[in-house]
């Protein structure tokens, strides 16, 4: 960009394809006795805001300014907070398509960018994919500025750092890397920044796409990052020393490094008394184990180890099985596929009919299958319990991994019996211990053993949770060095 207004406008018109882009606008006017132009994208700016705070002051500037003074005079005349100078045409175009207005004047090298964004966006609403029992009923939305504000309202401290950067080679999008300066593990932060620098893609559509570009083991069945739309959950992980990634246009945020326990815990556990939190965690753990192992164990015992079952139960199964034309493994596979189909359909249909569709479809199909003597009733109960267990898993990605593992474990149990199940679970545990998330052990703090809070599978009292993080060695890794309940004379 040079000082020739006509040449600069021609260059911008070419880069913006104004001949075929009707929403790329330019207005010419005079300010400080010089010809000037303002470029903006209709729909991304507030027209009233630009007219009142930008154009009106500049059009009424009748003074004369030299080429070296014009930029400073415009800055003084316009009462806007965010004003930046840019000299590269690509940077100027990036400012325009992000909702800024760009002012060019004759004799001024480069352009001045003014933040006059006013695009319509969704307001703050409760989380749509994570139910809230206790805690704030606020969820992230598609505006990165709103999402950053929600986190800063929960953690009002200058130690909360939010580094803004652009990601995407052809169509960049804003990305914010947030962490607590005094709690984050510096090696994990450096590793994340290095990975972000090495991401080369034309455009990042969603936070889920970014997850696939950053995770340590892209072919692993288990997710290695936490995705959430609850600000309180993201804030609690920031306090643990983890890093939160916010992408403009995505209502979820990405948290890493993460462990398996982070995928099983919920903010409601922390907001509840430790006895209640322990009960809820044990129920979720039971649901996960039922979802993963119950169908395979049923098939293995009925097919390979019937002598291990009670006589009355075995007699009932054999009597009903005699009238069914399919084998037990095939029955189980068909019913699991049917229940997964019902669950997927209930998600895709409109929300007002989704829950009704899931309940009615499950009841009708199950009853029809039993009456048609395609399956026996006990198998329907096993499939229903395992399906409920998979929906009790709080993380959506982990729930999908459990449902896929359920089918793999069913295959192992159908071929090798209980021995196949034991071998599969052993291989799963070995794989779990070898996984990492941003270089941190995914099975932390159990493997490898390290100092940690007692808050693992069970919910321990809050005042016993002194360690800040499991996944790194931050400078300040203690949440409290004194007694949290200092008033309690019993020393708790």
Where are these regions (language model features)?
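Generic detector of multi-pass transmembrane helix bundles and their immediately adjacent loops
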Residues: 297, 310-492
